[in-house]
Amino acid sequence: MERKSTSPAAQVLAPAVSEIRSLLEASRKNVAQQVNQELLLTYWKIGEVIVRYEQNDSIRAAYGEKTLSQLSRALTKELGKGFSRSNVYNMRQFYLSYPIFQTVSGKLSWSHYCELLSISDKEKRSFYEKEAVNSGWSVREMKRQVESSLFERLLLSRGDANKEQVLALAEKGVDYNKPEDIIKDPYVFEFLGLPEERPFLESDLEAALVRQIEDFLLELGRGFMFVGTQQRVTVNNSHYYVDMVFYNKILHAYVLIELKTTKLTPEAAGQINMYLNYYAAEVNDPEDNPPIGIILCTDKDSVAAEYALGGLSNQIFASRYVLYMPNKEQLIGQVEEVLKRWHSHEDE
């Protein structure tokens, strides 16, 4: 006998549930838009303050080209996250590119504008801004359209019919914005002073590796301090997360660790070097030494540990860092210990 999917009581309540859902969705959308509008206005005002103070002769004489870097450090120390050098630079550019705030669309997020600010041509930037508003493009979709040279293709097309065809093709794969997309934007978490939602580790095995490596380095007694897991790195308006970050107080250097449950690949090496460049430019204090990276890879056949030095020379690493860092054999031993426990549980 076939069961009915809904009870009579549920059917009676369905209109009320639908109306309440509509009210809640509308309210969430309004809240998201209000937060976004306030964020944009605040960052625009901060940009105006930066430009105004840059014109101060004493500040220009004291810091010169390093003004933004010094300001970024001062703001981060005083106010917390949200004031990386790149974000402070974008606030400045936001004000310079949109000197009249009323021309800024509240329908686009700060992440949208960070992407738009990378477009130097004013007409081209205006085109993508309007299309993003009219078509409801997400940041990811807008980036895809920019990379596909939609603006240039439209310029080359002849006649309105061809332009409509190009636009229609461009709309394929559109990922429209939702209120929760705005609220979950890392920039919004920073603006509101809320703890950021971090991605979960890919597997229980990676979580076990994190615990093992953290305990090992802290017990090593060579100046390691644990900063955290899944630490965000924002490069070209794209967000990435470093698996583990330590700071060595003896070396005055950050140590970034990436865990991979696959063989070591060139892509993994390139990714951690990108993280190292970010930390050197955005996180390091003037007295800090260059950061270093460690990649730990494990698959069915082997375990590997590799150091990533970024811009650091092998000679400096050998003379200054090696004494305080674990060697590859020690790191591999820690991974193998976790794998041994892991496989013994699987066999039970």
Name each region found by the language model.
Residues 1-348:
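Basic, low-complexity intrinsically disordered segments
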